[in-house]
Amino acid sequence: MNDLAHMRTNYVRSVLSEETAGFDPLALFSLWFSEAKEEGELEPNAMSLSTVNTDGKPSVRIVLLKGLIRNEFQFFTNYSSHKGKDIEQNRNVALTFFWPKMERQIRIEGTVTKIPKEESEAYFKIRPRESQLGALTSNQSSVVVSREELETKFQTLEKEWEGKEIPMPESWGGYSVSPNKIEFWQGRAGRLHDRIVFERKNENWIRSRLSP
């Protein structure tokens, strides 16, 4: 670990100009996301979700983007989890995408709400059966005695629901993040990175360039 001071990458892949950024951050996000997929980034829909509880304590974890619906970012999880409890207390969240092959990062700040139950159920029905059973098995973020306890419960539920449609747990569903700030970062040589930020004022997006 003593050589960390000498670890660095020189970013030379691309540039981000005002002309290429345009004035619609959601269109730019969709473009960058498509390019990340084409580049073969590992799980380009993986994003860090940052939450803060009422005591001001932050938490961050990786979740998967499952849709950009009605100009909002959707993900699914257990409502009783640590993140779910934080969100109940504080609806302000942040998302971060990092695509190292593209030398790009996107930061999103906004407010989060639960999506309608019928939309969560529609998504739950198309999940792989093992994932459905996993959601039914796990009381996310609760303490378990051992891995074996989880596997035994999974196997029991697998037999119980064999040949039947697995119901969505009441504690499981989707969230939707309405963005009010989106920042695009493109790595550049000499650490003079490009940073373009969009901030929502009423129904309009205001674009600015930030110093790196």
Curated annotation (Swiss-Prot):
FMN binds at R61, I62, V63, L64, L65, K66, F76, T77, K83, Q105, Q140, S141, W185, R195. GO terms for molecular function: FMN binding; pyridoxamine phosphate oxidase activity. Its EC number is 1.4.3.5. Pfam families: PNP_phzG_C, PNPOx_N. It catalyses: pyridoxamine 5'-phosphate + O2 + H2O = pyridoxal 5'-phosphate + H2O2 + NH4(+); pyridoxine 5'-phosphate + O2 = pyridoxal 5'-phosphate + H2O2. GO terms for biological process: pyridoxine biosynthetic process. Pathway: Cofactor metabolism; pyridoxal 5'-phosphate salvage; pyridoxal 5'-phosphate from pyridoxamine 5'-phosphate: step 1/1; Cofactor metabolism; pyridoxal 5'-phosphate salvage; pyridoxal 5'-phosphate from pyridoxine 5'-phosphate: step 1/1. Its cofactor is FMN. Keywords: Flavoprotein, FMN, Oxidoreductase, Pyridoxine biosynthesis. Substrate binds at R8, T9, N10, Y11, K66, Y123, R127, S131, R191, L192, H193. The keyword Cell membrane does not apply. Binds 1 FMN per subunit. NCBIfam families: pdxH, PRK05679.1. Belongs to the pyridoxamine 5'-phosphate oxidase family. Homodimer. Catalyzes the oxidation of either pyridoxine 5'-phosphate (PNP) or pyridoxamine 5'-phosphate (PMP) into pyridoxal 5'-phosphate (PLP). This is Pyridoxine/pyridoxamine 5'-phosphate oxidase. It comes from Leptospira biflexa serovar Patoc (strain Patoc 1 / ATCC 23582 / Paris). The gene is pdxH.
